[in-house]
């Protein structure tokens, strides 16, 4: 009996010891999360070029990861700043405040850029006045913010892109750093929001002249040009060209073009490779994925957007850009395997938006497509409203698919705003290029079909949004895009995007039900066992969460 009592006392003391010192079981998380947004990547690019991809890039993700095949944007407009915000917050423009790449302040009439911040200065660039950027216009937290909070800020978060908005907004408010490319200097820069000087490794990278080595041979096709059978012929009238070129054909003399215009790197695949190399330098510079807490690296490959805008989705240039990006991704995955460890990193790949086919391509193949002029529409709408209300200039502009009224003039003139909006809707719906015009405050009672009705509701933030929304005919682009393409509309070519999860705790699979872009962040939160962002409205993709 004495022995039993002694043993009981011993085990009770062990139990007390374990309670004091904590359970030895540790919450499992990946060492590193990598969030990739491929700018302007239509979902169909995964399969259009599938037979040409290697085994270690896109195919590695598709064959070894979990692909949500019907991931859709659930708001308007489908633009870069908004897309990156929704991906990394799980929110929508109505709550996040990021309603476009820029927007008109409805009270002042001033145009505001999404990441502009006059209280900070640029760091590492040509001038402190360049790079005055931060996430302060973002009204909610990101998944990257929530990871920092969950680990008591032991996690490190870094954003990388050629575009400021595609680095700053994903990295969130509390990021250790966000870096982007400055055309004037040809360097990656940041702002005093994050730091007062560039890290030594970033300065060394900027001084390494890596761009010169990437463009020294110009831009020719990666493979023989006659193998690019998924694309138009090389010389078509609806593709753009660089200044100085006689025709939009290979080879493109990028070395000479870049010497006089550094922004031209954005319209080549080499800017993606530059982004990859800087991201790898940041991986080492911040020792990401090698500490005690989970780190997060966000990467935007922006040149798929630049090439798409210039040449369009059916060009040899865009096909070549994706074949080269496939190799860049393979390089990144190999680096992660070596430096973080196979199975130790979690990655997701998505896009901020898609793109329309060029108008010339559509017309050539007898498909719906035409050019339109928002400025002409503003002029004619103002004339009509002046006839009805005897006050000129009631409409300031049309942007982000919305009509921006001069609300100060309307109220100071004692006009009925509802009557003005009704008159605007009546006029706009009679225009041949418009399918739907709707007063956003009345969209709930309108005959607008789903999913458009929900998309419109998700888009409206009064201080930064116009009051009447326009839905244009399918295939329409602004008159500026006589060559190349653009995006911003509700149509599937703009809103059907890839979403693939790969790596830590992810089993291969396919999901064909509809998933919204706003579901991405809460799904990552669930995988990491952390809180969703403060404005999250998305749903967890439960099919990808491992069973207990």
Q: What is each of the regions a protein language model found here?
A:
Residues 53, 70, 79, 101-130, ...:
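Secreted, luminal/periplasmic, and some membrane-associated catalytic domains
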Residues 92, 97-293, 302-309, 430-436, ...:
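His/Asp/Glu-rich, glycine-adjacent segments
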Residues 46-96, 156-160:
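Short, structured active-site-proximal loop/turn typified by the sulfatase FGly-forming signature C/S-X-P-X-R
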Residues 20-66:
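Active-site-proximal N-terminal segment of extracellular/periplasmic enzymes that hydrolyze or transfer
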Residues 1-25:
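Bacterial Sec-dependent N-terminal signal peptides
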Residues 265-291, 304-345, 423, 524:
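A long, amphipathic alpha-helix that forms part
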Residues 59, 140-149, 400-438, 513-539, ...:
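Non-catalytic, well-ordered alpha-helical segments in soluble enzyme domains
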Residues 372-415, 486-528, 542-548:
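Substrate-binding rim/cap in mid-to-C-terminal beta-strand-loop elements of soluble/periplasmic
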């Amino acid at each position: 009996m004495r022995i039993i009592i002694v043993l009981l006392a011993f085990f009770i003391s062990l139990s007390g010891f374990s309670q004091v010192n904590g359970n030895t079981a540790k919450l499992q998380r990946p060492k590193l999360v990598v969030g990739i947004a491929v700018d302007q990547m239509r979902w169909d690019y995964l399969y259009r070029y599938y037979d040409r991809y290697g085994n270690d890039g896109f195919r590695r993700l598709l064959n070894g990861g979990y692909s949500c095949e019907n991931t859709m944007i659930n708001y308007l407009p489908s633009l870069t700043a908004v897309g990156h915000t929704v991906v990394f917050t799980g929110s929508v423009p109505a709550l996040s405040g990021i309603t476009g790449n820029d927007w008109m302040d409805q009270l002042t009439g001033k145009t505001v850029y999404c990441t502009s911040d006059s209280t900070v200065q640029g760091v590492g660039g040509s001038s402190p006045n360049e790079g005055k950027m931060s996430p302060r216009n973002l009204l909610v937290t990101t998944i990257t913010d929530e990871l920092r909070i969950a680990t008591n800020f032991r996690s490190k978060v870094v954003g990388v892109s050629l575009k400021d908005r595609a680095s700053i907004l994903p990295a969130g408010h509390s990021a250790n750093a966000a870096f982007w490319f400055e055309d004037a200097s040809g360097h990656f820069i940041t702002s005093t929001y994050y730091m007062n000087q560039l890290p030594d490794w970033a300065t060394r990278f900027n001084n390494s002249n890596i761009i010169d080595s990437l463009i020294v041979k110009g831009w020719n096709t990666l493979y023989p040009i006659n193998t690019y059978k998924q694309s138009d012929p090389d010389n078509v009238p609806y593709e753009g060209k660089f200044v100085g070129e006689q025709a939009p054909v290979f080879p493109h003399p990028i070395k000479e073009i870049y010497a006089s215009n550094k922004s031209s790197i954005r319209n080549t695949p080499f800017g993606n490779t530059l982004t990859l190399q800087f991201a790898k330098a940041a991986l080492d510079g911040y020792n990401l994925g090698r500490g005690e807490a989970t780190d997060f690296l966000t990467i935007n490959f922006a040149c798929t957007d630049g090439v798409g805008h210039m040449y369009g989705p059916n060009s040899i240039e865009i096909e070549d850009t994706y074949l080269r990006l496939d190799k860049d991704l393979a390089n990144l995955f190999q680096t992660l395997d070596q430096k973080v460890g196979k199975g130790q990193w979690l990655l997701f790949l998505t896009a901020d938006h898609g793109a329309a086919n060029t108008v010339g391509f559509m017309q050539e193949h007898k498909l719906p497509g035409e050019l339109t002029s928002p400025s002409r529409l503003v002029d004619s709408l103002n004339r009509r409203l002046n006839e009805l209300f005897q006050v000129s200039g009631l409409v300031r502009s049309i942007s982000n698919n919305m009509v921006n009224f001069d609300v100060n003039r309307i109220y100071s003139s004692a006009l009925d705003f509802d009557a003005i909006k009704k008159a605007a809707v009546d006029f706009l719906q009679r225009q041949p290029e418009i399918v739907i015009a709707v007063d956003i405050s009345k969209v709930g009672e309108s005959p607008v079909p789903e999913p458009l009705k929900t998309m419109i509701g998700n888009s409206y933030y009064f201080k930064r949004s116009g009051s009447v929304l326009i839905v244009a005919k399918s295939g329409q682009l602004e008159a500026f895009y006589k060559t190349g393409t653009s995006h911003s509309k509700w149509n599937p070519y703009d809103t059907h995007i890839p979403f693939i999860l790969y790596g830590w705790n992810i089993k291969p699979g396919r999901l064909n039900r509809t998933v919204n872009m706003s579901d991405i962040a809460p799904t990552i939160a669930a995988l990491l066992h952390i809180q969703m962002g403060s404005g999250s409205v998305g749903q967890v993709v439960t099919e990808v969460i491992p069973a207990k």
